[in-house]
Amino acid sequence: MSGTEQAADAGQVVAEYWAAAEARDWGAFGALLAQDVVYEVPQTRERVSGRDAYVRFNAEGFPGDWHLAVQRIVSQDRAAVSMIEFSEAGASQHGLCFFDLDEAGRIVRITDFWPDPYEPPAGRAHLVSRY
């Protein structure tokens, strides 16, 4: 498989991952994961190891009527990065996820970041516009 084909496959796997999560299709979600998948959130230092534990974490760890929309996926070889918008009860936040795939094309590592918005330093207000 060429690097171009691998890049397309990694991006497609990540798109399928988010589609399964949005649909709460935990069987399809789990099928995309390697048995030894590791999920980490550096900001909270949480780690979930193993497919069954990670599927359970998602199925039980996020109750409520939430939704997500993929904003962007960038992939290369067996790696991909996604940016999503996660919405629940009128509030939303963005998530950045880094994915690594194994040789079989299953997700083996996920590193998840949830950046919080913040006010910029006042000293540079004259150098930027706000949106």
PLM regions and their residue ranges:
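C-terminal and inter-domain tail/linker signature
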Residues: 1-131
